[in-house]
Amino acid sequence: QTHQSHAAVNYYSKNQCTWWAFKRRAQVGKPVSNRWGNAKNWYYNARKSKYATGRTPRKFAVMQSTAGYYGHVAVVEQVYKNGSIKVSEYNFYRPLKYNTRVLSKKAARNFNYIY
């Protein structure tokens, strides 16, 4: 199933985590809605929009957390054989900046995923 509605224009604030996740998913042909709001709401809104979701990381899935005031999203770039994952994201280590990081298999279990 493809999800094309509301996916043409990136209305998220530039260089925020949601802006990057929207942009990256469009780049890899897996668009998400531009109307899901703050990162903390993405998992709920994805489910409401009939996206497949779960607790297991997959390549190009959105990794989502409700921690903090706004929550956080990142994009899974790689799932390694040992279960660790590499994610790309904005606004995590430094305000409005891009970074990648590797999370252990144990750490990766603490997040929701939008496929």
Predicted regions and their residues:
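Aromatic- and glycine-rich peptidoglycan recognition patches
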Residues: 80-115
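Secreted/periplasmic proteins that engage bacterial cell-wall peptidoglycan
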Residues: 3-80, 84-90
